[in-house]
Amino acid sequence: SVIYSWDHLHKLHKSSKSSARENLIRRMTNYQDITGERVVIVFDGKGQTSESINDEYGIQVFYSKSGTTAYQIIERLAGKYSKNRKITVASRDRAVLDTCSSFGADAISPKTLEELLEQAERDLRKRMV
């Protein structure tokens, strides 16, 4: 849902889904590098027979299997890890945010995530001057 919520990614997605995903992965990798916060991205796998996990640019990227949604994986991960770690979930789906929040995760909108990313990028530029 982040791809559909960020204008530049949504436009890119219309011409190339893989490019939009790649762009999101790279920007979130930068966020992880700047902030030191671990990033995990979950995508719908579009008919894959098994769930896959790739380590792309130093972050975990999950692709759901056929019959499972990215939202289900997000909820499962939040339920499993939010007891022991600070988890932040970004989604435009209110039900997903409510479920993850009930597990103890912080729940934010894609717009808030974009603002956090842009702030981290500004902070990095200031440090480099």
Identify the function of each model-found stretch.
Residues 1-129:
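Nuclease catalytic cores that cleave nucleic-acid phosphodiester bonds
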